[in-house]
Every structure is written in C-alpha cells, then in structure tokens.
Amino acid sequence: MADQLTEEQIAEFKEAFSLFDKDGNGNITTKELGTVMRSLGQNPTEGELQDMINEVDADGNGTIDFPEFLTMMARKMKDTDSEEEIREAFKVFDKDGNGFISAAELRHVMTNPGEKLTDEEVDEMIREADIDGDGQVNYEEFVKMMTSK
C-alpha cells in the first residue's frame, strides 16, 4: 500500500510525522495522530481516527511508528481519491445538476462517439442501478454501481 506513494509524498509525510514525534523516538501517540493528519489536508472523524489507530497499532501500546503511519496515510488517500473520482463521474452524467441521473442524461453521455449503446442497453443500465425504482439513478445508487465490481 505505502509503495504506491511518491517520494515527494513520503518526504511530506516524514516531515509531518517528525513534527509530532517530540522525543524523536520514531513513534507518535494516538492523540497526536489527528493533528498530523489534519496538517496533511485530511479531515478524519474521531471514529475514523480510532479505526485507523486500531488497524495500525498492532501491539496496542498507543503509539504508531513511521512505516505504520505511511500505510495508514496511503489507505486514507486511496479512499479519498476514489470518492472524488466517483463524485466527478456522477457530475458528468448529471447534466442538469439535480442530483439524479435520468435515462435521458445517461443516454446522452453513453451515445456520444466511442460509447455507442442502444436505447435498450441504456434502459437496462438504469434498471440495474435504480435501487429505489424511481426511474433514475441518485448519487448513492451511482456509488453502489461504481463500487460493486
């Protein structure tokens, strides 16, 4: 997971980590974790912080070393990227910005050059994604469709 980070990201994370490793022993306390992550532009909730700490702090001693921290940040960034990509994709389909993708909007995008789908295929896509049966796809339905592989 951490091997997907760039050298620049690793350097940035090391700098932030070092700022909070007050005694220079290579560990930060769980209390400091939230501050570190916020300094890097992440905004985890208390619950998310606790989950991350529990996942990473294998020996339960309440501290996190740098390799564990890198793994955790790589996971957090991957999740954020995915969410943003899905949100951007939703906006592409939701032409009128009303929070729903209608069959007409989907048809417009999917019948552009390179995507040639028939009306039947477009209707089938809507039916598969349309969990509440209202004939269009809302954001939650879109997320489910995009993440269920």
Curated annotation (Swiss-Prot):
Q: Does the keyword Protease apply?
A: no
Q: Record-annotated residues binding Ca(2+) 1? A: 21, 23, 25, 27, 32
Modification sites for N6,N6,N6-trimethyllysine? 116
Q: Which residues form the EF-hand domain?
A: 8-43, 44-79, 81-116, 117-149
Disulfide bond entries: none
GO MF terms here are:
calcium ion binding; enzyme regulator activity
User: Any idea which residues bear N-acetylalanine here?
Assistant: 2
- Report the Pfam families cross-referenced here: EF-hand_7
Q: Sorted alphabetically, which keywords does the UniProt record give?
A: Acetylation, Calcium, Metal-binding, Methylation, Repeat
Q: Where does Ca(2+) 4 bind?
A: 130, 132, 134, 136, 141
Domain of life, per UniProt, equals Eukaryota
| SMART domains for the chain | EFh (SM00054)
Record-annotated residues binding Ca(2+) 3? 94, 96, 98, 105
Q: Which PROSITE patterns match?
A: EF_HAND_1, EF_HAND_2
Instruction: Supply any other comment.
Output: This protein has four functional calcium-binding sites.
Tell me which family the UniProt entry assigns to this protein.
Belongs to the calmodulin family.
This one is known as: Calmodulin-2
The organism named in the record is Branchiostoma floridae
Q: From the UniProt record, report the name of the gene that encodes this protein.
A: CAM2
